Amino acid sequence: YFSVIGELGRAAAVTTSYTGNDHWPNLYAGAFTLVLVWLYVLNRRISWKEKVPRMLMLVFFLVSFADNQLDYIWHGMHFPQALPGRQSFLYIFVLLVMGFATIRKWKGTRRWHIIIAVLAALTLMVLSGYYGDELVTEYMAVVITMLFILVYGILLLLLKIAPKKM
């Protein structure tokens, strides 16, 4: 099929919904989730017993989107016609659950976590733009997503350094 890094470009903002037969999944869940998933991994208040299964699920879903046999099984032993990656809603749900856990345990996030999370999300977008298919994920979609990631990173840093009210 295609590379996992290339398919992450489908998580870019303003990416058009794909309905072709090349099986590119529609993975957009918001640019904020791209930062939150890294903050989830770095957050010390979230136990590894919770992190490992969720991260393994994300990896399994990404591999399922990119592997022909797993995608065939996910689609009920049929090749999809014009609706690829039907299980992408499960991937997005796991991302959102991880994002919610990150926000819920916000006190476990440090300033350097935010910087690393933003840099990691930006790196993933750069790699997906470089290795992705420009016909499926436009260059401007990757650039706009990177701008959103930077804005979210700045806002999160401002939130972290804001004086605490008693």
Model-derived regions: residue spans:
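Periplasmic/ER-lumenal interhelical loops and adjacent helix-loop junctions
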Residues: 1-53, 60-61, 67-75, 84-89, ...
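Contiguous transmembrane helix-bundle modules in multi-pass membrane proteins
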Residues: 55-65, 69, 78-166
